[in-house]
Every structure is written in C-alpha cells, then in structure tokens.
C-alpha cells in the first residue's frame, strides 16, 4: 500500500502538470500513512463508522489495529480475564461506551482505564468480579453509568468509586453484598450526583436506619432494595411504608418483591410480605427511626403572604413540628420571629417574603410516642411578580404592534389590487379621450379625411394604417431619379408600422420601403 519516496518525482514529472504536483503529492502521502493513522477493521469485528462490535470471537485482549476515533466498542461474550494498564494497547480518546459483559474478568487494576478517559458508560456486568478495590475507576472523570450487576462482588472498598463525580447510575444487583453501601452517600467519597442505585437481589439483611436519614431526599427516591433477605423489623417496615406513601417507584413498582424472614423459633422461619397492613402491629410499636424525604417546590412573590404545609407521613397525633431555615435558624411554634410563624400542625407562614428568604427549609416531624421522626425538605423560591409582569406586558405590546402592522399592510395591498382606483365617470371620460386621440391618428395616417369614408370602408380598413411621407429627390449622381427617405424618417416610419400593423400588413410595408419610385397622386 505504501510508496517509496524516490519514485514520487518520476511519477509526478511524467504524468502531472506542474500546477498539480503539490496536490497529488499530498494525496499520495495521505495514502501512504493512512492505514497507520485511521486503522482498519479487524477480521473478528464488525465496523460501522465510529461503532465497532467484536462480540463472541474468543478474544482475550483488544485488537491493536482498531480505528482510534471510535465512540462505541462492544467486546462482550469473549474471554478477557484481567484488566490491567496494558489490556488496551492504544488510546481511544473519543470512546464513550465500552461493553465488556459476559467475559471472565476477575479483577481490575489501578490504571486499567487510563487509555479511555472519556467513557460515559461502562458495562462490566455478568463477569466474575469478587471485590472492587480502591480507586480503580479514578481515571473516568466523566463516567455517568456503571453496570456491575450479576457478578460475585461481596466487598466494596469505601474509595472504590472515588473520583466519579459525574456518576448518576450504579447497578450492583445480583451480587453477594451483605451491607448497604452507605459510603456512596456520606463521607469523603460520597457521590453527589448519584440518583439511581440498584442493590436488589443481594444478601443485605438490614438497613442502617440511623444513617439513612442523612441521605438527601432526591437521592432516596432512586434506591432499589427489593429481593434482599431482610429480617422482619418495624423500622424497615416504616421506612418502606414512607417511601410507598410518597410514591417512590422503587417501592411502588416492586411492592411484592419486598419480603422478610419471620422466625417462629431458632430453626424455622418463613417469608412474609413487608408491605402489608397490620404487619407485626408495627403501626403502634416503638420504632426509634429517622427518615428523610424531598418535599414540594413553592413559588412566593415579594411582599405576598405564603403558607407552606409540612408534608409529613408520621401523622399529627403526638407529633411535634419544627422548621430549620436556610441559614440554620430554628423556627418553632409559639415563638415570635421576624416575618415567620409556625403553627402546631406544622404549617409555616412567611408574612412578607423577601429575596433573601429563598432557599431550602427542613420540616422535622417528631412522634414522641413511637420515637419516630421524619425530615421533609421544602424549596421556596421568591420572585418579583411586578417586574416579571412588566416584562411580559412589554413583550405582549411589541408582539401586538407587529401583528397589527402586518394586518394593516395586507389590507392595503388587497385594496390596491382588487378595488378600482378611478370611478366610472372618470373611466368614461378617459375612454372618450382615447377615442379622440385614435381618430386624430387615423386622420393623419389615412389618405383623406375620416369623415369622407363610408361606414363599410371604415369597418373594412379599421386595422390598417398607411403612411404617406414626402419623397425627397437625391441630387447626387447615380440615383437615376429615385427617391429615398432620410434614415431618421425611416426609423420613425418603421416604428409606427410595427406598432400598428397586423400580420396582413406585410404587403403595404414592402411597398413603402421598396426601391421603386413613389409617386404621390394629387
């Protein structure tokens, strides 16, 4: 495929013109280095522009001659066993999706993904991973989706997902985890953008009830726990009931998959549904748990009174309410506070909202009888309705003015096109004037007065015009007494004849401009 350099001048000199040598030289150099730069499609793969699929080809490593600018690489159903710093021989700067499911991957080393820094989706599902060690994904700064389901993972290092600041979805279903990965939400390596965590069908017997309240409400909504062998407990029951009442899809969609083991004695147990009425009489028992939820977003106007209700599911009986403002100020019932008031039923009133009052307010509902409390985060936005209304009014006026101008223009155009600009009387006078002018032309161009001709003659010769011009004798020698017209008069006569004659006037035109003597009769 490549060409030797010393043969290039000979080819260029023999075939190509001097003006095209540089262009052909550039093209031939491109052909020479092309395969090394762009890569080819390996025989074990299927390539489609920026997508390469090498599935079920018994591969143990990534082919080295792949196109480096691919965006999606599928290596599933192969026998790749170890991910180290050299398992990908080249750098894929634009690769955003890497699929490695159904391989024999047993471990991942630090630096395994240094050649794929821009991955957004990594699929390592259905492999043989047992542990995820510290910071093995730290190079993947923009990773958004990580799939690790259907492995043998029994331990997650607290720093295993350190550096994944953009991670939004993490799938850990179908593994051997025995503890809920609380480090994903609290601590040094927490993932602030994680909105979906699937730890279903693991081996988790209980939940850390005293720490689950630290998880923000927006992240709680995306935790899936179904299919785990929970031990029946009123705290867990209350947590799931709270999520169910708040219509969390993680509980609503998998209601019948939440079960627990109820021990009748030390040897025998049975599986029962967690989300059922009168479960273990938990509605009246002491729970000693804390829960957190994300409340509504309220819009307030500057200076207009706003009331916000505490959307707690603990019930109002034996429940006390307090609010915590954005500045961590405590707002309690029966206490005079500037611009704020809290009722005993948990409602918060802001008498005259200001811009600085906007933020997240936390309502804490505490049930003393059951030692149960819930925190509901409510967002309050404050805006100036007068300013926004004036801007909207100005926009409406501008739009209305533009529309009115367009309609007026269309009406004027229609009037100009379809309405007669001159009245009928004016039109009659104009037709009479045109008739007089036509008679005048006829009198000039006809051999005699128009009144002398009979009606039949006028009718027969209505479409013809004859021009009688005074012939001038040319005194120059050689003309034999012939007469001719001046060039300027010939042009004038020709213009008159062309504008007034029909197809039948060709004979009279020829007679006028012939070389035969023209004799005017008296």
From Swiss-Prot:
Residues of the LRRCT domain: 228-284
Cytoplasmic side: 420-522
Signal peptide (residue range): 1-39
UniProt LRR repeat ranges: 69-90, 94-115, 118-139, 142-163, 166-187, 193-214
Compartment(s): Cell membrane; Nucleus
Tissue specificity of this protein: Highest levels in breast, ovary, cervix, and uterus. Lower levels in lung, colon, and rectum. Differentially expressed in 56% of thyroid, 57% of pancreatic and 45% of stomach cancers.
Glycosylation sites: 58, 104, 281, 288, 345, 373, 381, 384
Keyword Cell cycle in record: no
Name of protein: Amphoterin-induced protein 2
Species of provenance: Homo sapiens (Human)
Gene: AMIGO2
């Amino acid at each position: 495929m490549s060409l030797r350099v010393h043969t290039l001048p000979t080819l260029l000199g023999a075939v190509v013109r001097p003006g095209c040598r540089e262009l052909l030289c550039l093209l031939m150099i491109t052909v020479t280095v092309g395969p090394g730069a762009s890569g080819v499609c390996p025989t074990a793969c299927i390539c489609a522009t920026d997508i390469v699929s090498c599935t079920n080809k018994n591969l143990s490593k990534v082919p080295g001659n792949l196109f480096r600018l691919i965006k999606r690489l599928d290596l599933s159903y192969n026998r790749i066993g170890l991910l180290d710093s050299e398992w990908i021989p080249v750098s894929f700067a634009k690769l955003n999706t890497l699929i490695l499911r159904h391989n024999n991957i047993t471990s991942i080393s630090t630096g395994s993904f240094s050649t794929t820094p821009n991955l957004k989706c990594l699929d390592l599902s259905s492999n043989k991973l047992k542990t995820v060690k510290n910071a093995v994904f730290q190079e993947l700064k923009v990773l958004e989706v990580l799939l690790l389901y259907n492995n043998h993972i029994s331990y997650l290092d607290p720093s295993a997902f350190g550096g994944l600041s953009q991670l939004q979805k993490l799938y850990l279903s179908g593994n051997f985890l025995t503890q809920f990965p609380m480090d994903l939400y609290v601590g040094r390596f927490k993932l602030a953008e994680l909105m979906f965590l699937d730890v279903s069908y693991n081996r988790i017997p209980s939940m850390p009830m005293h720490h689950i309240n630290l998880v923000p409400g927006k992240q709680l909504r995306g935790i899936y726990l179904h299919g785990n062998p929970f031990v029946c407990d009123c705290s867990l029951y209350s947590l799931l009931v709270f999520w169910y009442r708040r219509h969390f899809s993680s509980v609503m969609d998998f209601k019948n998959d939440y079960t627990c083991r109820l021990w009748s004695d030390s040897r025998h147990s049975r599986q029962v549904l967690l989300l059922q009425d009168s479960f273990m009489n938990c509605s009246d028992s002491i729970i000693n748990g804390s829960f957190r939820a994300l409340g509504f977003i309220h819009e307030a106007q500057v200076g207009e009174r706003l009331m916000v209700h505490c959307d707690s599911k603990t019930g109002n009986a034996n429940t006390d309410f307090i609010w915590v403002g954005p500045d961590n100020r405590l707002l309690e019932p029966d206490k005079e506070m500037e611009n704020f008031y809290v009722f005993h039923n948990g409602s918060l009133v802001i008498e005259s909202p200001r811009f600085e009052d906007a933020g997240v307010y936390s309502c804490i509902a505490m049930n003393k009888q059951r030692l149960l409390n819930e925190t509901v985060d409510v967002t309050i936005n404050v805006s100036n309705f007068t300013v926004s209304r004036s801007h909207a009014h100005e926009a409406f006026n501008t739009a209305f003015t533009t529309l009115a101008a367009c309609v007026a223009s269309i009406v004027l155009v229609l009037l100009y096109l379809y309405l007669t600009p001159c009245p009928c009387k004016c039109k009659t006078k104009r037709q009479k004037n045109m008739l007089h002018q036509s008679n005048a032309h006829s009198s000039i161009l006809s051999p005699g007065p128009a009144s002398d001709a009979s009606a039949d003659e006028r009718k027969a010769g209505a479409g013809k015009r004859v021009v009688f011009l005074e012939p001038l004798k040319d005194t120059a020698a050689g003309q034999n007494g012939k007469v001719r017209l001046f060039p300027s008069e010939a042009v004038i006569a020709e213009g008159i004849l062309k504008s007034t004659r029909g197809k039948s006037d060709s004979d009279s035109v020829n007679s006028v401009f012939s070389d035969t003597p023209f004799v005017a009769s008296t």
